[in-house]
Amino acid sequence: MSLHITSATEGQLQVHFTTKQKQYAVPDVPYSIRANVGCSELNTLLGTVLKDAGNKQGAKVAFDFLLNGEFVRSTLSQHLKERDISFEDTIELEYVERYPAPQPQDCLLHDDWVSAVQAKDGWILTGTYDNTVNLWNTKGKHKLTIPGHVAAVKGVAWISLNEQTGVFASASHDQTIMIWEWNMTTNTAECVHVCKGHERGVGCIAVNPAKTQMASGSMDTMLKIWSTELQADKGEPSATKKAKLEQDNVRTPVVTLAGHREFVSGVQWIDNTTIATCSWDHTIKLWDLSMGGIKTEFTGNKSFFDLSYSPLNGMIITASPDKNLRLYDPRSKHGNFVKNTYLGHSQWVQTCRWSTTNEYLFVSGAYDNRVKLWDYRSPKAPIFELIGHEDKVLACDWSNPKYILSGGSDNAVRVFKSRIAVDNTKDD
């Protein structure tokens, strides 16, 4: 199947197939193929090569193909022309097992809009516009409704979980964050701390990797850091005041960081001393807690509604009202922080979350009632669209690798089972 190419005008290309998934490797020889082939024809060819090599299992697998780190979503000739790549060059095509489609598993109905959701192990936390926090298991059973807030719950975050007890936090437009302790034996939840200090509604919270602190963003433009310890408070000074606050179970912030000019709409921990925030003021800021200030700042053209950081690849994905998601690399040294733009939604993109186990994948939810699953190597189109919501998608989560969750103004949490493709890309 190795041929000499005499002219690019013949519509032929010379390609090498390569993969990091060793169980699907083929001989490293050049193949002469038509330039106008797409993924379907490439799969047929690769299946034949695998079968001829005695890999009957591999011959049944569907693959996606990458050229220079980007998925091929058209014919090879069109892909090359759009990127001004010479037809005379030998093309190296990397192939990876196609990620299997997530399957709809459940619909968890609430009494009002679902504006926050996060899973941990077999449990799902939700926050709603009827001021409550709800607990579900991943089998779809509702376990507990927790009243306490006096305005919409806009953020939920697990702090710890064992066989007897769960500890989690909820953030609300009532300007407070509540830390809850859930007794699984009695199926009751007690508010052990009320975190007060924001002067307007709290829109987002996140817990650090060590589970010792949490960060919150608010309409008051402030970023605040709180202790998650259930014992002694480590709040701001004033011994008399502090004693009274502790007596009332009220917690004050460890640190308050000013810098944003509008609503702090998203917060994520990079590590235990670095926090990323986004805001309606068109900026993303990286904060260094050890020095108590801003380390890096990126400015965009639109407001940011949400962001998600991946420790697997070191990059940040953002959601914005211009229907786009953007990929940022905060490690960039030359000021070009935006690595790619993803257009696939038809209305405001409200929420986004990285996979916790696959460095390439993330999900997004938007006002077009759609949840989309993306591979960051495929900027022109999502790899799957997860259909089910009948109104705006307000929150999404992929904390548990098995489940993609989304909450919306249709009062529902949609649960999709995420089937994991075989991945042997890492060396033993």
From Swiss-Prot:
GO cellular component, one term: nucleoplasm
Pfam families noted in UniProt: NLE (PF08154), WD40 (PF00400)
Compartmental location: Nucleus, Nucleolus; Nucleus, Nucleoplasm
Residues of the signal peptide: none
Keywords: Nucleus, Repeat, Ribosome biogenesis, rRNA processing, WD repeat
Location (main, coarse): nucleus
Positions of the UniProt region annotated as Ubiquitin-like (UBL) domain: 13-97
Keyword presence, Nuclease: no
InterPro entries: G-protein_beta_WD-40_rep (IPR020472), NLE (IPR012972), WD40/YVTN_repeat-like_dom_sf (IPR015943), WD40_repeat_CS (IPR019775), WD40_repeat_dom_sf (IPR036322), WD40_rpt (IPR001680), WDR12/Ytm1 (IPR028599)
WD repeats: 109-146, 148-190, 197-236, 259-297, 299-338, 344-384, 388-426
PROSITE patterns referenced in this protein's UniProt entry, alphabetically: WD_REPEATS_1, WD_REPEATS_2, WD_REPEATS_REGION
Example GO biological process: maturation of 5.8S rRNA from tricistronic rRNA transcript (SSU-rRNA, 5.8S rRNA, LSU-rRNA)
Coiled-coil spans in chain: none
GO molecular function term, any single one: ribonucleoprotein complex binding
The family this protein is said to belong to: Belongs to the WD repeat WDR12/YTM1 family.
Function: Required for maturation of ribosomal RNAs and formation of the large ribosomal subunit.
PANTHER family the record matches: RIBOSOME BIOGENESIS PROTEIN WDR12, WD40 REPEAT PROTEIN 12, 37
Protein name: Ribosome biogenesis protein WDR12 homolog
Organism listed in the record: Anopheles gambiae
